[in-house]
């Protein structure tokens, strides 16, 4: 009797292992087949600062040439184009709401105007540009050449000693019909510390070079040279291998040289010159 009980117990133990071991192996295999989730914070890119960085260098180049304060140029671009996101900026690369034709090109769009204290919507022609930089160039030249009926219309803007004086001059010169225009421009300058760009930067040059990213490039693309304070990493240079690029700005600091480039007339960012292959002019 004792032997029968012992045999029965051994049988039950054997059955237990026969069932439990495959089940355990199945659970283990199922667990291992699932991807291991690692907690990872996605680094958010400050698109507003990237927009400022993309324009600040060229704004300083124009300041040296035309004496339009960079803080005013950038603040107007922010206000008029909604950080480059407006329909006018998207369709015509027009950052400043400049009306009329540019070299025979324009778009017709609705716009709000204030007349005799009342706001109304009208349809008007706006200048169409190939690039944001072309829009900035024309904006600076507008202040220099004035209008057909008043060549000195914007002279007070050029003579302003600081952004507050320049913003007031914009208002009194009739650049915009918004009665709060000067206050809005000054507020943007102060919020984003744009007056830090109000100086000539001899390390910056405007260039026009056809180029490509080297296949072996391991560098990153930045919102401005990575050696500058608060520069933002945008992507890897490998993202643009095989694409034609246009180098539009050059910055040299000691032995370090950086290029700002665009693709299909769209600004991309800054990259170390060692990642770039300049094509010879044909």
Swiss-Prot record:
Residues 203-281 form the GW domain. Induction: Expressed under control of sigma-A RNA polymerase. Residues 1-29 form the signal peptide. Gene3D superfamilies: 1.10.530.10, 2.30.30.170, DNA polymerase, domain 6. Optimal pH is about 5.7. Inhibited by EDTA. It comes from the Bacteria. One of its GO terms (molecular function) is hydrolase activity, acting on glycosyl bonds. Its cofactor is Mg(2+). GO terms for biological process: cell wall organization. Belongs to the glycosyl hydrolase 73 family. Is the major glucosaminidase responsible for peptidoglycan structural determination during vegetative growth. Catalyzes the hydrolysis of 1,4-beta-linkages between N-acetyl-D-glucosamine and N-acetylmuramic acid residues in peptidoglycan. Acts processively from the ends of the glycan strands. Also plays a role in motility, chemotaxis and cell division. This is Exo-glucosaminidase LytG. It comes from Bacillus subtilis (strain 168).
